[in-house]
Amino acid sequence: MLYEESILHLATAGQFIVCNDKYGLPGTVLPAYCTAAGKLFLSQLDDETLETWVRSHNLVPYTANTIIDPDELLKQIRQTRERGYGIVISELYDFVACISIPVISQDNRVLGALNF
């Protein structure tokens, strides 16, 4: 879920490769702008709110692939909106790619996300 400027992991299921000792554990907070789920949730904001969000946050590079240019980030988030799912490749951790698909309510609201 989107929590202020971050993504908050609520639950984890199955086996996964651990990048560090806290990645993916319930309660983990990660930056929204460089995670697949974060881009998915940000894509649900209207254009004005999204633009304000991106331009008001300090975009820190975690890897050489982290997008820190606001215009490029806005472009990627809008592509996420068009696609309907989020993708990142080595933006938060080197050599880690993620796809995030939405969990949608009956009235078409994004309630959460599943990450792979």
Give the ranges of each region predicted by the language model.
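Ser/Thr-centric signal marking residues that sit
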Residues: 35, 63-66
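Extended hydrophobic
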Residues: 69-116
